[in-house]
Amino acid sequence: MNCRSEVLEVSVEGRQVEEAVLAVLHTILLHRSTGKFHYKKEGTYSIGTVGTQDIDCDFIEFTYVRVSSEELDRALHKAVSEFKDALRNSGSDGIGQVSLEFYQKKKSRWPFSDECIPWEVWTIKVNVVSLANEQERQICREKVGEKLGEKIINIVEVMNRHEYLPKMPTQSEVDNVFDTSLKDVQPYLYKISYQITDSLGTSVTTTMRRLIKDTLAL
């Protein structure tokens, strides 16, 4: 199986890190979740509905849609908060990345553990910029909102390609494909990891600073 890989890059102010990453992760999982499966008998099941809600960001001029699941939201907040703290405490130039990996389990014979086979990985590269004053922060609030909107459109376009998804499992195999631990939604099995890098600034960071400078010059 070939694992698809998608990379998104965002440049934000420190206080925008959490909201920007959550907006991207929630958007991806909105398209990679189903309602709970209700099996009647082997091979026959119904799928519950997935509720959604709009989320307004505090530090970014942006609203996104997420699955209406407090359990899923808590799990994502925990992972992103750990990344944000690690980024802040790293002493580096404020550059890191978060990876969201979707996988399915392949049963192995005893005494070996199950094999986790990734089928899609999303990487969000995050560059933190330092701003001089409140005027620059307000401009960044708007510009980051515009850029996030472009990322969301890109995510939706990728989701609409109808590429590989794990086939719907039988009742006995559902835990090999979906996370069934949540009571109100059923995302594909996933895991989130992060990495802090020591690299110097990227073209995205430079572009954001140029956008702010050009806006101030108007």
Swiss-Prot record:
Record keyword Cytoplasm present: yes
Entry keyword set: Autophagy, Cytoplasm
A biological process from GO: autophagy
Keyword Cytoplasm: yes
Signal peptide from the UniProt entry: none
One term under GO cellular component: phagophore assembly site
Top-level lineage group: Eukaryota
Subcellular location: Cytoplasm; Preautophagosomal structure
Pfam families attached to this UniProt entry: ATG101
Principal subcellular localization: cytoplasm
Family: Belongs to the ATG101 family.
Known role: Autophagy factor required for autophagosome formation.
Name of the protein in question: Autophagy-related protein 101
Source species of the chain: Xenopus tropicalis
